[in-house]
Amino acid sequence: MTTLNLPHLRPHQLKLALLQPQIAPNTGNIARACVASGTELHLVRPLGFVLNDKNLRRSAMDYWPRLRLTVHDDSNGFFDFLRRDGARCWLFSSKGEGSLWQTRFTDGDWLIFGSETAGIAESVLAAHPGRVVRIPLAAGERCLNLAAAAAIALFEALRQILSDTMSPSRKGDL
């Protein structure tokens, strides 16, 4: 078996947010992906679990202590924070008109996901025209698990952001 000498991810400013996540193991898996990719995680209350939930910690494994985590009290405060910061946001929803494959991410973007049960509120989606993205699925299929969707979007954004920093011979290896 050949071992590839692939590059490590370089530091970046991408951020991922979960609006009112309900299922601790999903959030734990997303936290693990965030640590592994060097991405900040923001959780927006209310949460469907407590942060010391054993299922959350089990799914995040020993990655949790290294997680760069911010918890926001509510959606209104979170979106006010983003507006003040001038953040560029991408909201992921099965109702998105834009496709992940056509979205062009830049360093510093925010990837925002709704809860497992309700997704992102219609009013929030309507307030971000042109910024609502869906992950392409097979015909007739509704949606992906939140942790799977977040990982797909996160690593596609990183591929785009970081691939331009690699040597030409290694660009396809991210």
How should these model regions be labeled?
Residues M1-L174:
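Post-transcriptional modification and biogenesis factors for structured RNAs
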